[in-house]
C-alpha cells in the first residue's frame, strides 16, 4: 500500500498522538485505560455499589452511557435549545441494578452532567480525555455489532442483508473521531454517504450556502475515509469519482452500492480493537495494576490477559442461557462479530455458535422488564489462545483480488483457506455497465472473476499460547473449510443455495 507511510497506527489514532514509538504508544493507551478505570472506581463509590454490583456489566453500560452523554456537546446544545417535556438537558442517568434481600432491584439514578464531567476529568488528570470516551463508544459499537444484524438498515438503502459483514461500527456516533473511522466497515461508510446523498436529493438547500459548504467538506472527508479502506486502484478511482461529483445523486448511490458489493470479494481494510467494558478496567486499576507504566495494546495479547483474570457478571432473564450470554459478550470484547466462527471457536477453546442459535437477548435490560424473575451469573470471557487483531480484510496482495469470504470480515490474523462461492456474488454484478465509471467497474469485475478461492487468501500468522507473550511460536490451526462459518448466516446455510 503506497500510503502506508502516512497512516497512523490505531493506537496513535486512539490517543490523538503524533508519531510515537511502540513504547510511547503502549504507554499512552495504558494511560487512557487507567483513566477509564479510575473514573469507574469513583462512580461505583458515588453510587455505593458493592464489589459484585460494580462488576455487573449492565451497571457498567449505564455508567459508560452517562459519561458519553455528559460529553455529547452537540446533543447537549440541541437539548437546551429544544426543551422537551420531562427531560432535564443538564442531567444524565440510567438504571443501576442492586442486590436487595436476595433480589435484583432496578434504581433510576440522575446526575448533573457537570458533575459527571468533573469526575471524568479528575480521573484523567484534568483532561477531557476524548480517547477514553471514543474507546467506550467502540466497546458499545462492538456489542451492538454482535447483538444485532442490521438487516433493516441495509434493505432501506438498497443493499443486500448478506452484506452485514461490511457493517462493523454502524452504530458508532459521528463524533467518534479517527479511532472510530478506523473501525467502520465499508458498508457503514457507504450507508452514511447514501443517507447524505438522499438528503441532498430531497432538500435543494442541503449543499447550498454556508451550511452547505460544511456539508460538502464532511461529504468529501467521508469519501476519503472510505477510499482509504479500499485496497485496489480501481475501487479507489471510483471513490474519487464519487467524491468529485458536482451534484451527488442517484449515479453516485449506484456506484457506492456497486463498491459495497465488490467489497465482499475485494475486502476493505477495517481495524479491529478489543475494547472492554469499564467494569473490567476499574477492578484492575483498583487492584493496583498500572496500565500506563506496564503499557497496553488493543490489538495484541493484553486484552486476552486482562480477560483471563477478570470477574464480570451479567443479569440473566429466566429463559436465557448464561453460556450463550457469555459468548455474546466474549465476541463483543474481542471485536469478533464478523469473524469466522471456526477461527473464533479455536481461539476461545469452546464452540462459538451462530447468532440464530443463541438463547439470549441483548445485554441491556429494558425499563419495563420484570426484575422479580431476574437472575445473574458469571460471564465466561477467557480464551484458550490469543491472536493478533488484523486490519487487512484478508487480502494477500493489494492489486490482485483474493477470495474474501462472503459474510466474514476477519478479526484475527490467523491463516485460513476460504470456502467461497463466487457465482453467488458475481450474480450481483449483472446489470448496469455503462456510465462514467464503466471502465473501472469492468476492471473491478475482472479482478473479482480472477479471484481464485484455492489460494490461501488469508495469509495470517497463527494463534499463540497465552504464555507466548512475544508471539514467537505461531500455531497454525487447520480448519474444516467446507462451509462458511458465518455468525449471522451460519444457521441458515440454505440461503447460499438459492
UniProtKB/Swiss-Prot annotation:
Q: Which InterPro entries does this UniProt record tie to the protein? A: Flu_NP
Region Disordered: start and end of each range? 1-21
Explain the post-translational modification: Late in virus-infected cells, may be cleaved from a 56-kDa protein to a 53-kDa protein by a cellular caspase. This cleavage might be a marker for the onset of apoptosis in infected cells or have a specific function in virus host interaction.
One GO MF term on file is: RNA binding
Signal peptide location: none
Q: Where is this motif: Unconventional nuclear localization signal?
A: 1-18
* Cellular compartments annotated: Virion; Host nucleus
Q: Which UniProt keywords apply?
A: Capsid protein, Helical capsid protein, Host nucleus, Host-virus interaction, Ribonucleoprotein, RNA-binding, Viral nucleoprotein, Viral penetration into host nucleus, Virion, Virus entry into host cell
**GO biological process terms held by the UniProt record:** symbiont entry into host cell; viral penetration into host nucleus
Positions occupied by motif Bipartite nuclear localization signal: 198-216
Basic and acidic residues composition bias: which ranges?
A: 8-21
Q: May I have one GO cellular component term?
A: viral nucleocapsid
Return any one Pfam family short name: Flu_NP
This protein's source sits in the domain of life called: Viruses
The record describes the protein's role as: Encapsidates the negative strand viral RNA, protecting it from nucleases. The encapsidated genomic RNA is termed the ribonucleoprotein (RNP) and serves as template for transcription and replication. The RNP needs to be localized in the host nucleus to start an infectious cycle, but is too large to diffuse through the nuclear pore complex. NP comprises at least 2 nuclear localization signals that are responsible for the active RNP import into the nucleus through cellular importin alpha/beta pathway.
Oligomeric and partner information: Homomultimerizes to form the nucleocapsid. May bind host exportin-1/XPO1. Binds to viral genomic RNA. Protein-RNA contacts are mediated by a combination of electrostatic interactions between positively charged residues and the phosphate backbone and planar interactions between aromatic side chains and bases.
Family listed: Belongs to the influenza viruses nucleoprotein family.
Its recorded name reads Nucleoprotein
- Taxon lineage: Viruses, Riboviria, Orthornavirae, Negarnaviricota, Polyploviricotina
Amino acid at each position: 500500500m503506497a500510503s502506508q507511510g502516512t497512516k497512523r497506527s490505531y493506537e496513535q489514532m486512539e490517543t490523538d498522538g503524533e508519531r510515537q514509538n511502540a513504547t510511547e504508544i503502549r504507554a499512552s493507551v495504558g494511560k487512557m485505560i487507567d483513566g477509564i478505570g479510575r473514573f469507574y472506581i469513583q462512580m461505583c463509590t458515588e453510587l455505593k455499589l458493592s464489589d459484585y454490583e460494580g462488576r455487573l456489566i449492565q451497571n457498567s453500560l449505564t455508567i459508560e452511557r452517562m459519561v458519553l452523554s455528559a460529553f455529547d456537546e452537540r446533543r447537549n446544545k440541541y437539548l437546551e435549545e429544544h426543551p422537551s417535556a420531562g427531560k432535564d438537558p443538564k442531567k444524565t442517568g440510567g438504571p443501576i441494578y442492586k442486590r436487595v434481600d436476595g433480589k435484583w432491584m432496578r434504581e433510576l439514578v440522575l446526575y448533573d452532567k457537570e458533575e459527571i464531567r468533573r469526575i471524568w476529568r479528575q480521573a484523567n488528570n484534568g483532561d477531557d480525555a476524548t480517547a477514553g470516551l471514543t474507546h467506550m463508544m467502540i466497546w458499545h459499537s462492538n456489542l451492538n455489532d454482535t447483538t444485532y444484524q442490521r438487516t433493516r438498515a441495509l434493505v432501506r438503502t438498497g443493499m443486500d442483508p448478506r452484506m452485514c459483514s461490511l457493517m462493523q461500527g454502524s452504530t458508532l456516533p459521528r463524533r467518534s473521531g479517527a479511532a472510530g473511522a478506523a473501525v467502520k466497515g465499508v458498508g457503514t461508510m457507504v450507508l452514511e454517504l447514501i443517507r447524505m446523498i438522499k438528503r441532498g436529493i430531497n432538500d435543494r438547500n442541503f449543499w447550498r450556502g454556508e451550511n452547505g459548504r460544511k456539508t460538502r467538506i464532511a461529504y468529501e472527508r467521508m469519501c476519503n475515509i472510505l477510499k482509504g479502506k479500499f485496497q485496489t486502484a480501481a475501487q479507489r478511482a471510483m471513490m474519487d469519482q464519487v467524491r468529485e461529483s458536482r451534484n451527488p445523486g442517484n449515479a453516485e448511490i449506484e456506484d457506492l452500492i456497486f463498491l459495497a458489493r465488490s467489497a465482499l470479494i475485494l475486502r476493505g481494510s477495517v481495524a479491529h480493537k478489543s475494547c472492554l467494558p469499564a467494569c473490567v478496567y476499574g477492578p484492575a486499576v483498583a487492584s493496583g495494576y498500572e496500565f500506563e507504566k506496564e503499557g497496553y495494546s488493543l490489538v495484541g495479547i493484553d486484552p486476552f490477559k486482562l480477560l483471563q483474570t477478570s470477574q464480570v457478571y451479567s443479569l440473566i432473564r429466566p429463559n436465557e442461557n448464561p453460556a450463550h450470554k457469555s459468548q455474546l459478550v466474549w465476541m463483543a470484547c474481542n471485536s469478533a462479530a464478523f469473524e469466522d466462527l471456526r477461527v473464533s471457536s479455536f481461539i476461545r477453546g469452546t464452540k462459538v455458535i451462530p447468532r440464530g442459535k443463541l438463547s439470549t437477548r441483548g445485554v441491556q435490560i429494558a425499563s419495563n422488564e420484570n426484575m422479580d424473575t431476574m437472575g445473574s451469573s458469571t460471564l465466561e470471557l477467557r480464551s484458550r489462545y490469543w491472536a493478533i487483531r488484523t486490519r487487512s480484510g484478508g487480502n494477500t496482495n493489494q492489486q490482485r483480488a483474493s477470495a474474501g469470504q462472503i459474510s466474514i470480515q476477519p478479526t484475527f490474523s490467523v491463516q485460513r483457506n476460504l470456502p467461497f462461492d463466487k457465482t453467488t456474488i458475481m450474480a450481483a454484478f449483472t446489470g448496469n455497465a455503462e456510465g462514467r465509471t464503466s471502465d473501472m467497474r469492468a476492471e473491478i469485475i475482472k479482478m473479482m472473476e480472477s479471484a481464485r478461492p484455492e489460494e490461501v487468501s488469508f495469509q495470517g500468522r497463527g494463534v499463540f499460547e497465552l504464555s507466548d507473550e512475544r508471539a514467537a511460536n505461531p500455531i497454525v490451526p487447520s480448519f474444516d473449510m467446507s462451509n462458511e462459518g458465518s455468525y449471522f448466516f451460519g444457521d441458515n446455510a440454505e440461503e447460499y443455495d438459492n
